[in-house]
Amino acid sequence: DALNPKVMETELSGTNLSFVIPEANQLREFVVIQLDKTIPSISAKAAQMVINQNLHGTEQVDMVIISPLAFKSEAERLQKAHEEKDGLIIRIFTPEEIYNEFSSGTPDATAYRRLMKMFYDRNKDNAKAPKYLLLFGDGAFDNRFLTKDWKDVSENERNNMLLTYQTTESLDMYSYPADDYFGFLEDDSENAIYNYNSNKDEYPTSTATLNIGIGRFPVRTRKQATQVVDKIISYMNNSDLGMWKNNLCFIADDGSNADKYDPVHQVDTEQLTIMLEENKNSK
């Protein structure tokens, strides 16, 4: 019962922790926690005032940019360039603003999707529906930076990273982050993010399609943010409209030792190149 949790009586033998429960014809869930890794309780010192905001009152947009405060000036440069060049209506939000309004102040990747779904549900069938989402910041497989992989990453860089959505599997071969999650905006379509079914050794299929285009700038520092915006603005202002823009390079991962370097990604990439070749003259 999720509303009535109980502490199990356990027995520790070396590194093995065991407990006994009576047999039952129902699903029961057990959670193991490390007390030193739990979220600290709120104290008067940690509490702070939340500035009034009203993201729900925002007019419809073509594009949303989610940017840490440290990168906001660079996001504004990009916003201005797209508004002047492409006539887009763009709004920039910090992740904290989104959490405060869409996840009760708690950092939660689903809050990004809820923001976009709000815009989508208002005008899903006309020209005012949202078209693009840009995540202006790198992501991590460990959203809370608890693993040793992040011990050498500075606090400033951590603060400049945006959350990722990840599949429920925790196995190295079948777990992956997916920004696509933020773009499945029809009701219940978020389930299109495939979770590996270990019982059937397969991924389930889905007919859901993305409703917006999604991009991410994997930047962690102000210098990197400036460089990527400079590059994009330079690309937008390039008057050389030659065939070079149709030259594509596909790069595929070769897998890892965990899957014996299965070339599945290379096969998928080759299939994409074939599709492009066959449809290159399509409008």
Predicted region positions:
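Cysteine-dependent hydrolase recognition
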Residues: 1-283
